[in-house]
Amino acid sequence: MQKKETLEFQSEVKQLLNLMIHSLYSNKEIFLRELISNASDALDKLRFLSISDEKIKIKQNKLCIFIDYDKNKKSITIQDNGIGMSKKEVIENLGTIAKSGTKSFIKSIEKSNSEKNNQLIGKFGVGFYSVFIVSEKVLVLTRSFKENEKNGVLWESSGKGEYTISNIIKKDVGTEITIFLKESEKEFCDELNIKNIVLKYSNHINFPIKLKTKITKDNKILTPEEKKSYTWKQINTGKSLWSKKKSEIKDIEYKEFYKNFFNDNYDPLIWSHNHVEGKQEYVSLLYIPRKASWDIWNREHKHGLKLYVKKVFIMDQSSEFIPNYLRFIKGIIDSNDLPLNVSREILQNNENIYKIKINLTKKALLMLENLSKNHPDEYKLFWKEFGLILKEGPSEDIKNYENVIKLFRFSSTYINSENQEVSLEDYVKRMQSGQNKIFYITSDNYLSAKNNPHLEKLKEKKIEVLLLFDRIDEWMMNYMTEFKKIKFQSISKYSSYLENIFKDENNDQKNTEQKLSTIILRIKSYLKDRVKDVRFTSKLTNSPSTVTTDENDITTQMSKLLISTGQESPEIKYIFELNANHPIIKHVFNIEDKNIFNNWIELLFEESILSERGNLDDPNKFIHRINNLLLSNIIRLN
């Protein structure tokens, strides 16, 4: 071995090492991921060169990563037979950070908090230095594929500002890194711990990762010699499922992978597997679960895809790749273009990530469309589990608005069932001649929607109405304004268009309203500013009266939603509508006694409010009024 040469780290490296040792990488185990990833890159480079250069001869099946450990020495060794490094390359790669903007990077670490520190380092690809978080000393033995065995290199450092480098004899091409752990970090020097870290971060590396493993024999007693013996055992899966061609994978493999990888007991409803090449290279594998996770509505619930870079696990719950309204999707994104230590900050501000998100969103929506068309029964299960979440889509995703809402399912007057099975396309196909709006009503529950007085005339005319009774629906309809250029119309809001539909062609209604017109003035005189207006309506057939909101006013359901979330709601002044053909209205018209008339009007107004809101400010007063009317009826009959 030649005389050791002592060199100082580049000044920025000194700062970086100091920062890393004292503040970076709260998740210390990442050092092993970094070293394995570097080894994998070295193997990849050698394999690529062997394909492009016939002079370079390698055996593909011999490319491997070995992990050795020694508890007595508190050391871990990661060895590969990859491309290796020359002395010059060792100095360039391990003694300096050949990156522009390094100084500003160091400053950004110094200013930011510890959580961001863990992420910022990844921007500059300096993951190798993470070894100094857990080690007292690091040895690197390497030999470039271009050099003979006499030109091996030994690099040694304790991470305290300088390193030594010398030439050694190294028989094999490749790199061997040995780290000597600090006393406080000796737990890493354990077979099971190493195995678990590899499975967590590097299970899908393309090359075999072999760990020094104690020899075991099932139900057999080991000899003293065997107890001291070890063997090399591959611990990673190797080629990841998602990196294979779709044609090579059976459905059962997709299902089993999903259940094992995402810890789910149920088969997925559907999946989408895509390889993208070109300016961006990545693989995505998206799954729709059969059941919602128990905490999906929890504010602290984390969602997103598992992010891999070149098959190295980077992070869970990468929410930047999928919109919030698709947060039920589970899956994997494996990119060839992102830096290994990509941070969430980079993900949030990266144009390429945004483009991937656009593509993945389209793939996810197409997957759901295929499920709805080809497996309607399975789609019913999906809608039951995730429909409420998908309904957040119109407010979040204008670009995919039409593709999102065509996936929605509703209850309607057509199916006469609480089941939400009607699509907007179904509704449009059944629209009446001349109908140019999609009618809907929002309510607290199915029965109150189904039996709402606003539906009476529409049912008679066999005009379908969507029944919306999920809590989110009223809020959703602020964003869901049209479908295929057909506007939505709430039937609980006053609309001249609706009134024209309600009116019959004969003049009976008009004549009756003219005869009873004075009742409108009497009611207005009594209710005064408690109502916005009083008018006759043609929408009612069985009910004597109802209330509706004006076209530009807040609806009852929106008011309830605001109050339930602790917000203030504007006061609603209803339009009080009367059915001139109803016997009760005709009876009240003929009442001359002011007190009795007012009592009847109060009763009709309150029951209309009760039907609309589901509650009254003073229900006891309402009950008392009913009892008085019943009592007066009994007295009159006797």
Curated annotation (Swiss-Prot):
Subcellular localization: Cytoplasm
Pfam families tied to this protein: HATPase_c_3, HSP90
Gene3D superfamilies: 3.30.230.80, 3.40.50.11260, Heat shock protein 90, C-terminal domain, Histidine kinase-like ATPase, C-terminal domain
Main location class: cytoplasm
Region described as C: spans on this chain: 561-638
Ranges where the record places region B: 345-560
GO molecular function list: ATP binding; ATP hydrolysis activity; ATP-dependent protein folding chaperone; unfolded protein binding
Gene Ontology CC annotation, any one: cytoplasm
The keyword Nucleotide-binding is assigned to this record: yes
Region of interest (A), residue spans: 1-344
Alphabetized UniProt keyword annotations: ATP-binding, Chaperone, Cytoplasm, Nucleotide-binding, Stress response
Keyword Cytoplasm attributed: yes
SUPFAM superfamilies the record matches: ATPase domain of HSP90 chaperone/DNA topoisomerase II/histidine kinase, HSP90 C-terminal domain, Ribosomal protein S5 domain 2-like
Coiled-coil stretches: none
Stated role: Molecular chaperone. Has ATPase activity.
HAMAP family documented for this protein: HSP90
PANTHER family per the UniProt record, alphabetical: HEAT SHOCK PROTEIN 90 FAMILY MEMBER
Family per record: Belongs to the heat shock protein 90 family.
Subunit and partners: Homodimer.
Protein name: Chaperone protein HtpG
Species name: Wigglesworthia glossinidia brevipalpis
